[in-house]
Amino acid sequence: MASTAVMMDVDSSGVNDLHHSEKKYAEEDQVQELLKVLNEISKTTLTLDPRYIWRSLKDLSSLRNQELLNAETLCFTVNVLYPDSSSFKKNLLKFITSNHKSSVPGSAELRNSYPASFYSVNTEKKTIEVTAEINCFMHLLVQLFLWDSKELEQLVEFNRKVVIPNLLCYYNLRSLNLINAKLWFYIYLSHETLARSSEEINSDNQNIILRSTMMKFLKIASLKHDNETKAMLINLILRDFLNNGEVDSASDFISKLEYPHTDVSSSLEARYFFYLSKINAIQLDYSTANEYIIAAIRKAPHNSKSLGFLQQSNKLHCCIQLLMGDIPELSFFHQSNMQKSLLPYYHLTKAVKLGDLKKFTSTITKYKQLLLKDDTYQLCVRLRSNVIKTGIRIISLTYKKISLRDICLKLNLDSEQTVEYMVSRAIRDGVIEAKINHEDGFIETTELLNIYDSEDPQQVFDERIKFANQLHDEYLVSMRYPEDKKTQQNEKSENGENDDDTLDGDLMDDMSDISDLDDLGFL
């Protein structure tokens, strides 16, 4: 590439093009940056070490931030990288630019200067093709280009006609595990976004077809032990179930599979725990949902890219805590970059804490649209009974004996029968210690027993011990045990490698694609 000009030209070969003499230029620096990433991927082809693909996928965010994924750069790279005999070249150019007959002068000479590790020999057709790893990565770059360009219809068509049949159904290599996971992410993301933005008649049929296709490839990924692809497909299928309100189907789906917790990026695990928490919260299992949402917040990368996910997770965590009868601490609502997003939930918490049913109703009405957008409205509506129970508890602590009618007036309830029912539930749930006199229509609180004579302290300490043991076990599993330094130095000297190794865990954290979901809202 040293012989190329600073601005490399891409000529149009259209016959009827009135402006065929015009040229679009691709900057050499941008092309060189792409070639560096491709060169890193080619090392995986030679060594079968997936760390190089991890590093390349980590560089995707910087490529997008620097706007290197533009039509001119991609068009030039595809024209030079792919031989004219390649069956993938035409399809890529077709979706990058409207005129897929564009060409690069001297592309053959430039191609000859590329490393031989970029190419492989197709024994069946007896032609030279780009290696599977680089080919799939180039298709991923085109996906990102169409996504960033808001070309959703073209992206869906590209996925349906090119990516799924020509890549995912064609290649059968374990080295493609990481790239395939990314490809599936943007396949489903583009489908979901287009379905939300446009009301198509056949959207339900297309959704069923896509879900069945993901189920099919989930079986293949499980058999091949492609953990990253398997985890990605499980998350996407769960997201699809929840998008369509099929909570029971999602629960059955989870019960019939085993999620891979090894060799999986932390962002995928965080998303999986979030979905599990959502499902359990809808099914009234709040204690299990609370455990999963705490795990999701801990697993998620704590950086600017995952801010939207962390905000949504904390909103769900607040709702679950309130439904469990717990009140979040004030510091919970003052976390950095979350004060504004958690403001509606702060007012809800305040209403629940005071047992003020009137304030609770006005807060729900005021922030209804925000709660619907967060998909927590139904959970927040369930808090009405908690508000009433809290109000009854405050009243029982204040009065030794009080009539049901007075409670009805204080809590603004409909009738005395409603009050009697709610007080009965509060007594059953252990919220208050009281007796109801049905004949005279009043309740009488009893003396509170010494709490240390009950089993409550034992249960609290048991929960704390279990949490500490679970945290200890998870840290042991996630620890990296480095090899002997002498062995590493000997291997590096033999292979001639002097570059610093990066921990796989760091690469997994930085490879998060959570930020692309922020605009959609996180279930």
Swiss-Prot record:
<dbReference type="InterPro" id="IPR036390">
    <property type="entry name" value="WH_DNA-bd_sf"/>
</dbReference>
<feature type="compositionally biased region" description="Acidic residues">
    <location>
        <begin position="496"/>
        <end position="523"/>
    </location>
</feature>
<dbReference type="GO" id="GO:0008541">
    <property type="term" value="C:proteasome regulatory particle, lid subcomplex"/>
</dbReference>
<dbReference type="GO" id="GO:0006511">
    <property type="term" value="P:ubiquitin-dependent protein catabolic process"/>
</dbReference>
<keyword id="KW-0007">Acetylation</keyword>
<keyword id="KW-0647">Proteasome</keyword>
<feature type="modified residue" description="N-acetylalanine">
    <location>
        <position position="2"/>
    </location>
</feature>
<comment type="subunit">
    <text>The 26S proteasome is composed of a core protease, known as the 20S proteasome, capped at one or both ends by the 19S regulatory complex (RC). The RC is composed of at least 18 different subunits in two subcomplexes, the base and the lid, which form the portions proximal and distal to the 20S proteolytic core, respectively.</text>
</comment>
<dbReference type="GO" id="GO:0043161">
    <property type="term" value="P:proteasome-mediated ubiquitin-dependent protein catabolic process"/>
</dbReference>
<keyword id="KW-0597">Phosphoprotein</keyword>
<feature type="modified residue" description="Phosphoserine">
    <location>
        <position position="454"/>
    </location>
</feature>
<dbReference type="Pfam" id="PF08375">
    <property type="entry name" value="Rpn3_C"/>
</dbReference>
<protein>
    <recommendedName>
        <fullName>26S proteasome regulatory subunit RPN3</fullName>
    </recommendedName>
</protein>
<comment type="similarity">
    <text>Belongs to the proteasome subunit S3 family.</text>
</comment>
<dbReference type="InterPro" id="IPR050756">
    <property type="entry name" value="CSN3"/>
</dbReference>
<dbReference type="GO" id="GO:0000502">
    <property type="term" value="C:proteasome complex"/>
</dbReference>
<dbReference type="GO" id="GO:0030234">
    <property type="term" value="F:enzyme regulator activity"/>
</dbReference>
<dbReference type="InterPro" id="IPR000717">
    <property type="entry name" value="PCI_dom"/>
</dbReference>
<dbReference type="GO" id="GO:0042176">
    <property type="term" value="P:regulation of protein catabolic process"/>
</dbReference>
<feature type="domain" description="PCI">
    <location>
        <begin position="270"/>
        <end position="450"/>
    </location>
</feature>
<feature type="compositionally biased region" description="Basic and acidic residues">
    <location>
        <begin position="480"/>
        <end position="495"/>
    </location>
</feature>
<dbReference type="InterPro" id="IPR013586">
    <property type="entry name" value="26S_Psome_reg_C"/>
</dbReference>
<feature type="region of interest" description="Disordered">
    <location>
        <begin position="480"/>
        <end position="523"/>
    </location>
</feature>
<dbReference type="Pfam" id="PF01399">
    <property type="entry name" value="PCI"/>
</dbReference>
<comment type="function">
    <text>Acts as a regulatory subunit of the 26S proteasome which is involved in the ATP-dependent degradation of ubiquitinated proteins.</text>
</comment>
